C-alpha cells in the first residue's frame, strides 16, 4: 500500500484511557528516544490541568500512527487566569507521512475544535525551524513575541577542543579559564546581607505567597504557583533541576532554577527560571550563585531565554550574557481561540515573562 492509500484509511479521534503505552512507544520510535511511560504520565496526566483531553490521535486499522498533543496550563493574562495549551509531541509515523495537508492538517483541525470546546483561550508553542515554517504556512500560527537566547561562557574547554589536538592542554586551559571566570563572578556584585540563599529540592505552599508578590510584575506569564512549580521541577522523572531560593525574614523573595546536560563535546547549562521581587541585588545574587554552581559542575557555557523587553535582561547582561542567534530555537507562535484575549495585548513583548521553563524541551 502506497502512502496516499494509507492516508485515506486514517481516522481522527481523541485519546482514550489505555492508549498511553502505544502512544509512548510511537514517540520513542519517531524521535529515537527512550522515554519511560512514567514520564508520559507526568507530562500529560499530572500537569496542572489534565492534558489528556488535548491529545488528538490518528489511527489506521486500529493502530495509532500520529498525534497532535498539548499540555494545558493556566496563563496569567492581565488581571485574570485563562486556560492555555502548549503544543508538544506532534508526530506522524514515517510510513504515513504524505502531504502536510494530510494527517497533520486533520489532527490540527480536531485539536482546534477540542481547544475551543474545552474553554482554551490561546495556544502557544516553541517550534523548531521546520515546524515554524509549516505552522505559519498551513496552520494559521502567528508570531507571538520576540524572544532572545542569551549566552555566557564559563570555560573555554569546548571551544578549544575543536581547535587543539592535545587533550591535556585543552583540559588544563579549560580548568584555568573556569577558575578565572569564577573569580570574576565572585568579586562582582554585592549580596543583601539579610537575605538567606538555600538550595532546595522541593517547594511547599509558601511559594504561593511569593507568586502573589511577583505576579503583577508582568501582565502575561504562565502561572508559577506551587502546583505548577512542583509539577515542572520536582515531580518530573529523572529530575535534573537545581533550585536556589532566596528568603528575607522567612519569606521567599526570589528563585533561580538551573540544570546542565552533556551534548556532543560540551556541557551546557540552562537558566530555567529567574524570578524575584523588584530588587536588583537579589536578582544579581541569585544569578551569581546559580552561575557559580554551574561552573563548579564543569559547565562550558550557559543559556537563558528571555522576552526581548524583560527588565531581567539587565541582570543577565551585568553577568556577562549576550544575545546569541542560532544556538537554540527562538520562535514562539500562537493561535487565539477566544475573545477573552486580544491579539494586540498578546503580541506586546513588553508584557511577557518567558523562560526556558516554559518549553518542554529543556
Which sequence ranges carry the predicted segments?
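Membrane-interface helix-loop-helix junctions at boundaries between adjacent transmembrane segments
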Residues: 96-98, 104-108, 112-136
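Active-site/acyl-donor-binding loops of N-acyltransferases
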Residues: 2-7, 72, 121-179, 232-234, ...
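Short loop segments at secondary-structure junctions
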Residues: 60-62, 95-96, 155, 249-250, ...
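Conserved N-terminal entry element of GNAT/NAT acetyltransferase domains
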Residues: 1-18, 180-203
